[in-house]
C-alpha cells in the first residue's frame, strides 16, 4: 500500500443572480482592489474552497476604507449582495459559517448598513409562501442565531415576524403531514421540518431572552400572542402520537421553556410545574393565557409519554445550579422523581423505557447540583437509607440486565450518581465504614457473577470506596472475575471492572508504600492469576483474557512484561502445553504478542535476543494448540509501527509457518492467519516505501559509505525473494485433491498479496507484483479452483483472477479454448448436479468480465451494443446482455419441453441452472448504471414471463400437500390406488399420464424413462439423458423434487435481484425505467402466491429471500402506490387468515409453511425509525386470534396465528419492538397448550419455546436451566407485569386440581409450561422488602404441584421450587416439607404426594449443600443437624414398611446427600449427629435391605432399577468404611464388593465396578501401588469377565483389568478363567475384533497391555510370541479402518502411544520389519484422519516416538507438542532415521515406495465408471476431504526418502522388488496418459472427479519414477538434486532446542 492521500474537502461554490453580477461589474474598479472587484472575482470562481479564501479578505479590505466609505453606493450594494449570498447558502455549506465569522469582524461604521441589508433579506425569507421552502427559512433563522452578530440583530429587528412565521409554518407543515398519511418518505421529511421548527423557536427564546426580556411580559403585544400560539402548537405536538418521539420529546422541552419564559412571578414556577406533573392543578389558579394554550395539560388526563417528556423538559430547562429555586425547587425535584417512579411501572415501550432511564439519570445529576450548592433540605431525602435512593436502587437492580445496552449504561450512571449523592449527604464521613456502603458492597458481592449489572456497580464502588475495602472482604475476587471471562457476554464488563480495580489498587499501594515492594504485591494480586489462566484455562477464557484484559494491564503497567516473561520462562520446560492447554509456552507467546502489538517492545530484535530464543518461536509456530500458533504468528506479524522493517528471521519463520498451517480446520483460526499475514504484507509494503526513499537519499553524491548505501537494497531484495517464496508455497498448496481449508487459506492469502501489492501507478514503486509470478500453469490452477464443491473457494479464485486482470487478458487469446470453455459452462449450467451450475456461473462471469466470449456469440450482438466498447463498464454490460440472451434462448426451449414432461426435465435438463447463471450475471452488473435501457426493457419483460412459466411447470410438486419428494409410483396395485387421492390434488401441466395415473414398478425404486416410453406414445427419444449417454437415467423422487424446489428457489432469487432495478417511475416514457409499476405488482403477486401456497420449505424459504429484497425496496420507493403495497398485502393476508374460508389455499400444516415467512418479510422491512404501525396492527390481530377459543370458525386461524407469532418472536430484526407483545404471546401459548386440538397444542409448544428463547436468551449452559438463562422475578415481572396475575392465577388453578381422581391426570396440561417459565425465575438478594412483585405467593402452589399424578410434572415442580427459595430459607423449608410427610402409622396417604415432596427436598438439599460451602462451619452443621433430625423422623420411607420403590429410592438419595457432606465420627469423638444415631440408621437400612436379604422382585416392579442404583450408591461408602475398620484383617463383613459384583442386577454391578474403576484409575495416574482390595479381587474380576453378559459391566471389567498391572492378575487366568495367559490374550483380541465399539477399544488396549507385558517378561524366548505379535499387529491395522467408529481409532492411538518405545522406536526391533512398518503406517493413517480428535491423539504417538533416546536427534522438535500437519513430516523423518539405525534400508525402501504408489488401486475402474450410484446421491460430487490430502503425504514421504538417500549415501543393489515397482509404475504412467486422452475437452470442469483422481495418481507415479531414477546408477546424491517442490519445505534439523 502506498501513502494514503489526504481527503480533499468538498465545498459547493456560491453563485449570485445575473442582476447582482451586473451590479458588481458596474462597481468593480480597473485595478481590482475594491470590494466589488473582490466579490466579482469570488463569485466567478467555481471552487468553493478558493471562494473561502476570497471571503476571508472582505473585512481586511473594508478596514482600509475610510469613514466616508459608508456612503459609498458600491459598498452598500456589496453589503446587500453579501446578505443575499448568506441567505442563499445551505446550512451545511462551510461558506456560510466562514462568511458569518468574517462579518463578525466588520468595522463598526458599516454595521448599521449591513444590519439593514440582512434585515431586508431576512424579511424576504419570512415572506416565503412555499411550504417546502419553510425548512430553508428555518435553517437561516437558526444560523442567524448561531454566533453571528448581524444575523442576531436582524432577527431581533424582525422578532414579531419571525415568531409569526414559525407559528404559521408549523401549523401548515403539520396539516401537510396529515395529508400524506401513509407516505413514509414524505412524512419523515415533514416531521424533520417540524423538529427543526421547534428547535429554532427554543433557540430564539433562549438567545433573545437577555436583550429583549421585556418583550415576553407584555400580554397585549403581538409577540406575546405568537408565543401563546407557539405554546399551543407545542402542546399539540406533545400529545400527538402520530409524530416521531423526537418531535414529542423536543416539544416537551419547548413547553417548559416557554412557560418558564412567560410565567410571572418566577418564584411560583416550580409550584405550577409540580401541579401540572402531579395532575393536581386547579383550573381557577392557572393563568388564562396558560389555560388557553395548554388546556390539555391542565385539565385532562395525559398519556404517560407526555408526562415523561414534561419531566425531561423540567429537568433540562430549569436552573438547578446553586439552588436558585429554593425550597420550592427542591420540592419540585422530589415530585419529579416520584412521577418518574410511577411512570416506570406503566411504560413498556422500549423507546420510552430508554427516555425514562436517561431522564432518571438526568434527575440524579440535578440532585447532585442542588446538594453541592449546600442545600440542607434535600439531605434527609437523598441519604442512602431514605426512600428515594432505595427506589432508585430498585430501578437499577430491575434494569441492569435490560437487553438495551444504552439503558444498562444509564443504570450505571444512576448508581454512580447515587453514591455521589450519599457522599454529599454524609458531610465528610468515612464511607468505608458507612453502614449503607457496607451493606451495598456485601449484597453486591453475594450476587452471582453472571449478572452484568454487578460489574458496573462494583466498579462504581471501587471508585468511591477504594479496592482495599473490597479485597479485605474477599481477596480471591480477581480470580473469580477471571473465571467468568469464558462467557463472551460478560467479558467486556469483567475486563472493565478488573481495569478499574487494578488501577485503583496500584494508586493505593503506591501512595501507602515508600519502597518498591508494593509492586510484588500488585503483581501477585493482578498479574499472576492472569498467567495461571493463560497456562491452563479453557479455550474461550484464554482467548478473551488475551483480547480484552492482557492489553489493558500491559498498557497500564508495561514494566510487568518482564515479570510475566520471568515467571513463564521458568515454567516453559515443564509446561509446553497440548491440544487442550496452551501451557507456559503459549502464555509466553500471548504476552509477547500483546506487548509488541501495543508498542511495549521496541523492536523484534529486542524480543528475540532478550526475551525468547528462536527455538521457542519455532516450537510455537507448530504447537498442537491452535491459539499458541496464532499468538506466535501474531508476535511475528503485528507491530505498533506500520513501517517497522521485517527481519530475516521473521521472514524465515513466517515461511515455515505457512508451510504447515494452511490446512487449519477452524474457520476462526484460518481467518486469524489470513488477517495476520495481511498485516505482515502491509508492513512489508509500507516499510519498503521508506526503504525506497532511504535508498534514493543514499544514492546522492554526498551520501555516506557504501555499506550503508547498499543496506536498503539488500532488504528490498530479501522482501522480494520472501514474497515470491510465499507465493510459491501457496500455489503449490493448490494441488489436485487439496482440502477445502488449504484452498481457502491459500487463495485468501494470495488475494491479500494481490491487494496489498497492486500493479504500480505513476511513480509509486512496489517491492513485489504477484502478476510477475503468474504463468499459464498457475493460471490454470486458479481456474481449476472453480471446480471446488465449496462456493467460498470459487469466489476467492474469481476475485483473485479479477485482481490479476492484466494476466487474465493474456490467457484468453485462443479462440478454440474460449469456445470450449463457453461450451463447458453451458453444459454445466444444465447439469443434474446442483453445484455444477454454480461453477458455470463463475466461468460465464469470468468470460464476460474479460471480454472473452466466443466470436460466434459476440458476432450475434446488435451493432448498437458496440458503442463505448473501450470502457470496462460498457464491455461488461454488453457481454452480460449477450450471455443472458443466450441462456434465455436455451431456457425457453427447455421450459417448452418441461411443459410436456417434467420427468424428462428433471433427469436431463433441470432448468434451475440456467436461471442461476442469469441471476449471477445480474448480480455482478451495476444495476443502477445501465446504459442500454432500450435493450434491457424487452429482455426483462421476456425474462419475467419465462420465470412465471417455469414456476408454473414446477408448482404442482411444490404446492402439493403430499409428502415432500413424492413420485406417484409404487410396487403394488393396492398401494398405488391409495396414492390416487393425492394425485387428484395435483394439477400439473405434464401432457403425459405421469401425474394422472399411478404406476406400478417391478423390483426397482426408480422410474426408468425407457419403460415409460413404451406405454406413453408421446415420449420418444427425448427421454434419454441429455449428453448422449448410453444408458437412460432413472428418475428418482429426489431428482424431481430437487429440480422443482431449486427452480422455484432460483426464480425467487432472480426476481429479488431484478427488484433492485427499482425505484420505478410511474411514466413509461422515462428513459431509465426498466420495470413498470404493473410488473412490480406482478412480482409481488407471484411471491404472495408461492409463499402462501408452497409446501416445500426449500421453496418458500428462498422465495422469502427474494420477497424481502422487494419489500425493502418498496418501503424506500418514492412512488406512493408502490410504497403502500406491503401494507395492502399484509391487511389482505390477515383478512384471509381470519376468514378461515374452506376454499382457502393457505397451508395449515407444516407450521403454516410459507405464511409466517410472508408476514415476516412484510414486517421486517418496515422502517425501524417509524412508529412500526404495521407491526402493532399485526400483533394485535394475531394475539387476538391466538387467544380465541371460538370453534365456530374452526381452529385453523388460531393455528396460523400461533405459527406466525412463533416466527415473529424468533426474528431478531424486530429487536425490542416485539417485546411489548411477549406477555400476550405467552398467554396464548400457555392457554393453547390446554386445547383439545393437537394442532393448537403443537403450535403453542413451538411458540412457547420461541418466547423462552426470546426472553431468557439462547441456552448456553449444559444444565437444563443455565444461570445465564435465568432472570430475577422482579426483572421479569417488571418487564411483563401482565404475566404476574396471569401466571399466579393459572398456577393456582392447576395446583387446586392435582388431587383430582386418577381418572383425569391430564386435566391441566398447562402445568408443564407454567413450571418451565417459573423454574427460570429466582428472587434476588437485591429485591429488598418490596412485595408488589414478590415470588413468595407462587411457592405454596409450586409445592402443591409436586402432588401431580404425572411423574414429569413432579420433577419439574421440584426443580422450579429451588430458585424460589432464598438460600437462608432453605433449611426451614426443608424441615417443613419433611414434617409434612406422613408417618408410618398413618392410614391413608398417596405415594404421588410423598414422591413429589421428597423430590423437592432432594433438589433443595442439593442446592443448599452446593451453595453453602463458603458458610461458617458452625452455622452449616447446625442447620444440617436440624434437617437430619427431620429426615430421621421419616426413616420408615426407606424401609420395607414403604411398599413403593420409587419413593424409597428418592429418600435414600436424600440420605446419600447427607452422608456425603457429613464426616463420619472418629473413634473417641462423638458429634451431635452421632447422638441422633444417624450412622447407625444408615447402616441398618443397608443391612436390612435387599442387597443383604435378597430380592423378591423382577424387573417388572416399577422403580426397581432406580431403587437399586440409589441403594447401591448409599451402600458403597459403607463398604469402604468397613474395609477401613478391618484395616486389612480378614474379618467377615456383611456387605462387600464381592457380594455386590455377584448381584443378579446389572445396576448394582455397574455402580460397584464404576467405584473400583475410579480407584484403579486414580492409583495408576498417581503411580501408586494398587489397593490391596483390587489386587485381591483378581478372581472375581476374571470370573466376571468370562460370564458377564451386560455390555456396560463387561466394558468396566475390562477397563479395571487394563488399569491394573498384568503381573497382579495375568498369572491367575489359568486357575480362575481356565485360560492360559496366551489363550486369554487371544480371547481379548477376539473380543477386540468382534464386539461393539466401546468394548472393542477397551479390549484392544487390554490386549496391547498384555502383549507388551509378555514381550517384556519373555526376553529370552521372544520367537515363541511371533504368531501372537503378528495377530496383534493385524488387529491394530484393522482397528484403524474408516468403517469403524472414532472410539476404535482413538484406542489405537492410545495403544501405539503406550507401546511406541517398545514396538516403534526400539533400537532392537521386536517385530518383523513388515509388522513394524505396518504399525508406522497406522500412525500415518491416523495423522491423516478426517477427525480432529484422532489426529490429536496420533500426534501424541509422534511426540513419544521422537522423544526417545535413539530418536531425539532425528528432529529439532523432540519433547515438543506439535500439530498434526507437521507431525506427519516428523513421523516420516523419525521412521527414515530408524531404518538407517536398524540397517533395514534395503528391505524397507520398496515398502515405502509401495506406499507412494498405492499398489492395488483400481485406477481404470474408477475412471470408467464414475457415475456409479449417481442417481441416488445427486448432491455428492466426490469423496470430500476436509483434512487428508494424498499428495501432502506423497510429498512428505518423497522429501524424507530423498533426504535419507542423500544422507546415507546408500547404493541400491539390483533388487527384484524395485524392478517390480519400476514395471508397475511405468505401466501405470502409460495407462494414466491413455485415460487423460480419453477425457473430453475441459475435463477439469466436465469430469472433475475423474480428472482429479488421474492427476493425483499421476503425481504419485511420477514421484516413484523420480526416486527410482535417482537410485539407478547414481552413486552420490546431492540435496540440490531434489525437486524444488520437495526441497522447499525441508525442515532443517541443526538447531538445538532451548
Swiss-Prot record:
One of its GO terms (biological process) is lipid homeostasis. Pfam families: DUF2428, TPR_Trm732, TPR_Trm732_C. The gene is Thada. It comes from the Eukaryota. The modification Phosphoserine is found at residues 1006, 1015, 1152. GO terms for molecular function: enzyme regulator activity. Keywords: Coiled coil, Phosphoprotein, tRNA processing. This is tRNA (32-2'-O)-methyltransferase regulator THADA. GO terms for cellular component: endoplasmic reticulum. Belongs to the THADA family.
Amino acid at each position: 500500500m502506498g501513502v494514503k492521500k489526504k481527503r480533499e474537502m468538498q465545498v459547493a461554490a456560491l453563485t449570485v443572480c445575473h442582476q447582482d453580477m451586473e451590479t458588481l461589474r458596474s462597481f468593480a474598479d480597473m485595478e481590482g482592489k475594491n470590494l466589488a472587484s473582490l466579490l466579482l472575482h469570488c463569485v466567478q470562481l467555481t471552487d468553493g474552497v478558493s471562494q473561502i479564501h476570497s471571503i476571508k479578505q472582505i473585512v481586511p479590505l473594508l478596514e482600509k476604507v475610510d469613514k466616508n466609505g459608508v456612503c459609498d453606493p458600491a459598498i452598500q450594494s456589496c453589503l446587500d449582495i453579501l446578505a443575499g449570498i448568506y441567505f442563499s447558502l445551505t446550512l451545511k455549506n462551510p461558506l456560510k459559517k466562514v462568511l458569518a465569522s468574517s462579518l463578525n469582524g466588520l468595522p463598526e461604521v458599516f454595521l448599521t448598513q449591513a444590519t439593514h441589508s440582512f434585515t431586508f433579506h431576512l424579511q424576504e425569507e419570512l415572506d416565503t409562501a412555499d411550504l417546502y421552502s419553510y425548512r430553508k427559512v428555518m435553517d437561516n433563522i437558526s444560523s442567524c442565531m448561531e454566533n453571528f452578530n448581524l444575523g442576531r440583530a436582524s432577527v431581533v429587528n424582525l422578532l414579531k415576524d419571525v415568531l409569526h412565521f414559525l407559528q404559521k409554518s408549523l401549523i401548515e407543515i403539520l396539516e401537510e403531514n396529515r395529508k400524506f398519511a401513509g407516505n413514509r418518505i414524505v412524512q419523515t421529511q415533514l416531521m424533520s421540518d417540524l423538529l427543526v421548527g421547534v428547535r429554532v423557536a427554543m433557540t430564539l427564546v433562549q438567545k433573545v431572552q437577555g436583550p429583549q426580556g421585556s418583550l415576553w411580559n407584555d400580554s397585549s403585544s403581538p409577540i406575546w400572542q405568537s408565543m401563546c400560539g407557539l405554546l399551543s402548537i407545542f402542546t399539540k405536538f406533545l400529545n400527538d402520537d402520530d409524530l416521531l418521539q423526537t418531535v414529542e420529546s423536543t416539544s416537551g422541552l419547548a413547553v417548559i421553556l416557554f412557560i418558564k419564559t412567560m410565567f410571572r412571578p418566577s418564584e411560583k414556577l416550580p409550584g405550577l410545574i409540580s401541579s401540572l406533573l402531579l395532575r393536581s392543578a386547579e383550573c381557577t389558579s392557572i393563568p388564562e393565557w396558560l389555560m388557553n394554550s395548554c388546556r390539555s395539560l391542565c385539565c385532562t388526563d395525559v398519556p404517560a409519554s407526555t408526562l415523561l417528556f414534561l419531566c425531561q423538559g423540567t429537568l433540562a430547562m430549569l436552573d438547578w445550579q446553586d439552588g436558585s429555586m429554593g425550597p420550592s425547587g427542591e420540592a419540585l425535584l422530589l415530585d419529579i422523581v416520584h412521577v418518574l417512579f410511577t411512570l416506570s411501572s406503566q411504560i413498556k415501550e422500549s423507546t420510552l423505557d430508554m427516555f425514562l432511564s436517561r431522564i432518571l439519570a438526568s434527575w440524579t445529576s440535578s440532585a447532585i447540583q442542588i446538594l453541592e450548592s449546600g442545600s440542607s433540605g434535600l439531605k434527609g431525602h437523598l441519604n442512602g437509607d431514605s426512600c428515594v435512593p432505595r427506589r432508585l436502587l430498585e430501578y437499577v437492580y430491575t434494569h441492569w440486565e435490560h437487553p438495551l445496552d444504552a439503558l444498562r449504561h444509564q443504570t450505571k450512571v444512576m448508581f454512580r450518581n447515587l453514591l455521589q449523592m450519599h457522599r454529599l449527604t454524609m458531610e465528610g464521613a468515612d464511607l468505608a465504614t458507612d453502614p449503607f456502603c457496607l451493606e451495598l458492597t456485601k449484597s453486591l458481592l453475594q450476587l452471582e457473577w453472571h449478572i452484568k449489572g454487578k460489574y458496573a456497580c462494583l466498579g462504581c464502588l471501587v471508585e468511591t470506596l477504594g479496592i482495599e475495602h473490597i479485597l479485605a472482604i474477599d481477596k480471591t475476587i480477581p480470580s473469580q472475575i477471571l473465571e467468568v471471562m469464558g462467557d463472551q457476554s460478560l467479558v467486556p464488563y469483567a475486563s472493565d471492572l478488573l481495569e478499574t480495580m487494578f488501577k485503583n489498587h496500584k494508586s493505593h499501594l503506591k501512595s501507602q508504600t515508600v519502597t518498591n515492594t508494593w509492586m510484588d504485591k500488585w503483581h501477585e494480586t493482578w498479574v499472576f492469576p492472569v498467567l495461571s489462566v493463560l497456562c491452563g484455562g479453557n479455550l474461550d477464557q484464554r482467548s478473551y483474557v488475551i483480547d480484552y484484559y492482557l492489553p489493558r494491564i500491559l498498557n497500564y503497567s508495561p514494566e510487568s512484561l518482564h515479570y510475566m516473561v520471568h515467571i513463564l520462562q521458568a515454567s516453559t520446560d515443564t509446561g509446553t502445553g497440548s491440544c487442550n492447554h496452551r501451557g507456559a509456552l503459549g502464555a509466553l507467546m500471548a504476552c509477547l504478542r500483546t506487548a509488541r502489538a501495543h508498542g511495549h517492545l521496541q523492536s523484534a530484535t529486542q524480543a528475540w535476543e532478550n526475551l525468547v530464543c528462536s527455538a521457542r518461536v519455532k516450537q510455537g509456530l507448530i504447537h498442537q494448540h491452535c491459539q499458541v500458533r496464532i499468538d506466535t504468528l501474531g508476535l511475528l506479524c503485528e507491530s505498533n509501527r506500520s513501517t517497522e522493517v521485517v527481519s530475516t528471521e521473521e521472514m524465515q519463520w513466517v515461511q515455515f509457518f505457512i508451510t504447515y498451517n494452511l490446512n487449519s480446520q477452524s474457520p476462526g483460526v484460518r481467518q486469524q492467519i489470513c488477517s495476520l499475514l495481511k498485516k505482515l504484507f502491509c508492513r512489508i509494503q509500507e516499510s519498503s516505501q521508506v526503504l525506497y526513499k532511504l535508498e534514493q537519499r543514499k544514492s546522492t553524491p554526498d551520501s555516506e559509505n557504501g555499506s550503508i548505501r547498499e543496506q536498503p537494497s539488500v532488504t528490498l531484495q530479501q522482501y522480494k525473494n520472501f514474497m515470491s517464496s510465499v507465493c510459491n508455497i501457496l500455489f503449490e498448496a493448490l494441488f489436485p485433491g487439496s482440502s477445502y481449508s488449504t484452498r481457502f487459506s491459500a487463495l485468501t492469502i494470495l488475494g491479500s498479496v494481490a491487494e496489498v501489492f497492486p500493479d504500480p501507478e505513476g511513480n509509486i514503486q512496489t517491492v513485489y507484483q504477484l502478476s510477475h509470478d503468474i504463468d499459464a500453469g498457475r493460471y490454470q490452477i486458479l481456474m481449476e479452483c472453480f471446480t471446488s464443491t465449496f462456493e467460498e473457494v470459487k469466489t476467492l479464485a474469481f476475485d483473485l483472477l479479477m485482481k490479476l486482470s492484466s494476466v487474465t487478458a493474456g490467457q484468453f487469446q485462443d479462440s478454440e479454448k474460449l469456445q470450449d470453455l463457453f461450451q463447458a459452462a453451458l453444459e454445466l449450467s444444465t447439469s443434474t448436479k446442483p453445484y455444477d451450475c454454480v461453477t458455470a456461473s463463475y466461468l460465464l462471469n469470468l468470460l464476460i468480465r474479460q471480454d472473452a466470449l466466443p466470436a460466434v456469440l459476440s458476432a450475434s450482438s446488435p451493432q448498437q451494443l458496440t458503442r463505448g466498447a473501450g470502457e470496462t463498464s460498457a464491455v461488461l454490460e454488453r457481454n452480460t446482455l449477450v450471455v443472458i440472451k443466450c441462456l434465455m434462448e436455451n431456457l425457453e426451449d427447455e421450459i417448452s419441453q418441461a411443459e410436456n414432461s417434467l420427468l424428462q426435465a428433471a433427469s436431463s435438463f433441470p432448468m434451475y441452472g440456467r436461471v442461476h447463471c442469469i441471476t449471477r450475471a445480474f448480480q455482478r452488473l451495476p444495476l443502477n448504471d445501465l446504459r442500454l435501457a432500450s435493450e434491457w426493457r424487452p429482455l426483462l419483460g421476456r425474462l419475467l414471463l419465462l420465470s412465471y412459466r417455469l414456476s408454473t411447470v414446477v408448482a404442482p410438486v411444490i404446492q402439493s400437500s403430499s409428502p415432500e419428494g413424492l413420485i406417484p409410483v409404487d410396487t403394488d396395485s393396492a398401494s398405488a390406488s391409495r396414492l390416487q387421492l393425492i394425485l387428484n390434488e395435483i394439477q400439473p401441466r405434464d401432457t403425459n399420464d405421469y401425474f394422472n395415473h399411478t404406476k406400478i414398478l417391478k423390483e426397482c425404486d426408480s422410474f426408468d424413462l425407457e419403460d415409460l416410453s413404451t406405454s406413453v406414445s408421446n415420449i420418444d427419444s427425448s427421454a434419454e439423458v441429455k449428453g448422449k449417454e448410453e444408458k437412460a437415467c432413472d428418475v428418482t423422487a429426489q431428482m424431481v423434487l430437487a429440480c422443482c424446489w431449486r427452480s422455484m428457489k432460483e426464480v425467487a432469487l432472480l426476481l429479488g435481484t431484478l427488484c433492485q432495478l427499482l425505484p420505478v417511475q410511474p411514466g413509461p416514457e422515462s428513459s431509465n425505467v426498466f420495470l413498470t409499476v404493473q410488473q412490480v405488482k406482478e412480482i409481488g403477486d407471484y411471491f404472495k402466491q408461492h409463499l402462501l401456497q408452497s409446501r416445500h420449505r426449500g421453496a418458500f424459504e428462498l422465495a422469502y429471500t427474494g420477497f424481502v429484497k422487494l419489500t425493502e425496496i418498496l418501503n424506500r420507493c418514492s412512488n406512493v402506490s408502490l410504497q403502500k403495497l406491503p401494507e395492502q398485502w399484509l391487511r389482505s393476508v390477515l383478512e384471509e387468515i381470519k376468514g378461515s374460508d374452506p376454499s382457502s389455499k393457505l397451508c395449515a400444516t407444516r407450521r403454516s409453511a410459507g405464511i409466517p415467512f410472508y408476514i415476516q418479510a412484510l414486517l421486517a422491512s418496515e422502517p425501524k425509525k417509524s412508529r412500526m404501525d404495521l407491526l402493532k396492527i399485526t400483533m394485535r390481530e394475531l394475539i387476538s386470534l391466538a387467544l380465541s377459543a371460538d370453534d365456530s370458525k374452526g381452529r385453523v386461524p388460531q393455528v396460523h396465528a400461533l405459527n406466525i407469532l412463533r416466527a415473529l418472536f424468533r426474528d431478531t430484526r424486530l429487536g425490542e419492538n416485539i417485546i411489548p407483545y411477549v406477555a400476550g404471546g405467552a398467554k396464548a401459548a400457555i392457554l393453547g397448550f390446554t386445547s383439545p386440538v393437537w394442532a393448537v397444542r403443537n403450535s403453542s409448544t413451538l411458540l412457547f419455546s420461541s418466547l423462552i428463547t426470546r426472553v431468557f436468551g439462547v441456552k448456553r449452559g449444559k444444565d437444563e436451566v443455565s444461570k445465564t438463562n435465568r432472570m430475577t422475578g422482579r426483572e421479569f415481572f417488571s418487564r411483563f407485569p401482565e404475566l404476574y396475575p396471569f401466571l399466579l392465577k393459572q398456577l393456582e388453578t392447576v395446583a387446586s386440581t392435582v388431587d383430582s381422581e386418577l381418572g383425569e391426570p391430564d386435566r391441566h396440561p398447562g402445568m408443564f409450561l407454567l413450571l418451565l417459565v417459573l423454574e427460570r425465575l429466582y428472587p434476588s438478594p437485591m429485591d429488598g422488602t418490596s412485595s408488589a412483585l414478590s415470588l413468595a405467593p407462587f411457592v405454596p402452589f409450586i409445592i402443591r404441584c409436586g402432588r401431580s399424578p404425572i411423574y414429569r410434572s413432579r420433577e419439574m415442580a421440584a426443580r422450579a421450587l429451588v430458585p424460589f427459595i432464598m438460600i437462608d430459607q432453605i433449611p426451614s423449608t426443608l424441615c417443613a416439607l419433611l414434617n409434612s410427610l406422613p408417618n408410618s402409622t398413618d392410614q391413608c396417604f398417596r405415594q404421588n404426594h410423598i414422591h413429589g415432596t421428597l423430590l423437592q427436598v432432594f433438589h433443595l438439599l442439593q442446592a443448599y449443600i452446593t451453595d453453602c460451602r463458603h458458610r461458617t462451619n458452625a452455622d452449616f452443621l447446625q442447620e444440617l443437624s436440624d434437617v437430619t433430625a427431620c429426615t430421621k423422623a421419616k426413616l420408615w420411607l426407606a424401609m420395607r414398611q414403604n411398599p413403593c420403590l420409587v419413593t424409597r429410592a428418592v429418600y435414600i438419595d436424600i440420605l446419600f446427600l447427607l452422608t456425603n457432606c457429613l464426616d463420619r465420627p472418629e473413634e473417641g469423638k462423638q458429634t451431635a449427629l452421632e447422638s441422633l444415631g444417624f450412622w447407625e440408621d444408615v447402616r441398618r437400612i443397608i443391612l436390612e435391605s435387599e442387597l443383604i436379604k435378597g430380592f423378591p422382585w423382577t424387573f417388572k416392579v416399577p422403580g426397581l432399577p432406580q431403587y437399586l442404583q440409589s441403594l447401591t450408591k448409599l451402600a458403597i461408602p459403607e463398604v469402604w468404611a468397613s474395609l477401613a475398620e478391618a484395616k486389612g484383617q480378614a474379618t467377615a463383613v456383611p456387605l462387600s464388593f464381592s457380594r455386590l459384583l455377584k448381584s443378579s442386577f446389572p445396576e448394582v454391578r455397574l455402580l460397584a465396578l464404576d467405584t473400583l474403576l475410579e480407584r484403579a484409575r486414580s492409583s495408576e495416574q498417581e503411580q501408586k501401588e494398587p489397593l490391596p482390595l483390587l489386587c485381591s479381587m483378581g478372581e472375581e474380576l476374571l470370573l466376571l469377565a468370562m460370564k458377564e453378559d451386560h455390555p456396560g459391566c463387561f466394558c468396566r471389567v475390562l477397563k479395571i483389568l487394563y488399569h491394573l498391572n498384568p503381573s497382579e492378575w495375568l498369572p491367575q487366568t489359568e486357575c480362575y478363567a481356565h485360560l492360559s495367559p496366551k489363550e486369554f490374550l487371544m480371547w481379548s483380541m477376539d473380543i477386540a475384533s468382534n464386539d461393539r465399539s466401546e468394548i472393542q477399544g477397551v479390549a484392544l488396549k487390554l490386549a496391547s497391555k498384555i502383549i507388551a507385558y509378555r514381550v517384556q517378561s519373555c526376553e529370552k524366548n521372544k520367537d515363541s510370541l511371533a504368531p501372537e505379535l503378528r495377530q496383534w499387529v493385524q488387529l491394530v491395522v484393522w482397528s484403524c479402518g474408516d468403517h469403524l467408529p472414532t472410539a476404535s481409532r482413538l484406542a489405537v492411538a492410545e495403544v501405539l502411544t503406550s507401546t511406541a518405545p517398545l514396538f516403534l522406536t526400539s533400537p532392537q526391533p521386536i517385530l518383523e520389519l513388515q509388522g513394524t512398518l505396518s504399525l508406522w503406517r497406522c500412525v500415518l493413517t491416523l495423522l491423516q484422519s478426517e477427525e480432529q480428535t484422532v489426529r490429536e491423539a496420533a500426534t501424541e504417538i509422534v511426540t513419544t516416538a521422537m522423544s526417545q533416546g535413539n530418536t531425539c536427534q532425528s528432529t529439532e522438535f523432540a519433547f515438543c507438542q506439535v500439530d498434526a500437519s507437521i507431525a506427519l513430516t516428523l513421523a516420516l523423518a523419525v521412521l527414515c532415521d530408524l531404518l538407517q539405525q536398524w540397517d533395514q534400508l534395503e528391505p524397507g525402501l520398496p515398502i515405502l515406495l509401495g506406499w507412494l504408489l498405492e499398489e492395488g488401486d483400481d485406477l481404470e475402474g474408477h475412471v470408467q465408471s464414475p457415475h456409479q450410484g449417481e442417481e441416488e446421491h445427486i448432491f455428492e460430487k466426490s469423496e470430500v476431504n476436509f483434512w487428508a490430502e494424498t499428495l501432502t503425504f506423497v510429498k512428505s514421504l518423497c522429501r524424507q526418502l530423498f533426504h535419507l538417500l542423500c544422507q546415507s549415501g546408500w547404493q541400491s543393489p539390483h533388487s527384484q522388488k524395485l524392478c517390480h515397482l519400476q514395471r508397475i509404475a511405468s505401466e501405470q504412467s502409460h495407462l494414466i496418459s491413455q485415460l487423460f486422452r480419453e477425457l473430453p475437452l475441459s475435463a477439469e470442469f466436465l469430469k472433475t472427479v475423474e480428472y482429479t483422481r488421474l492427476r493425483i495418481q499421476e503425481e504419485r507415479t511420477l514421484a516413484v519414477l523420480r526416486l527410482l531414477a535417482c537410485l539407478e546408477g547414481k552413486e552420490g546424491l546431492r540435496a540440490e538434486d531434489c525437486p524444488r517442490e520437495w526441497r522447499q519445505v525441508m525442515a532443517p534439523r541443526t538447531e538445538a532446542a532451548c
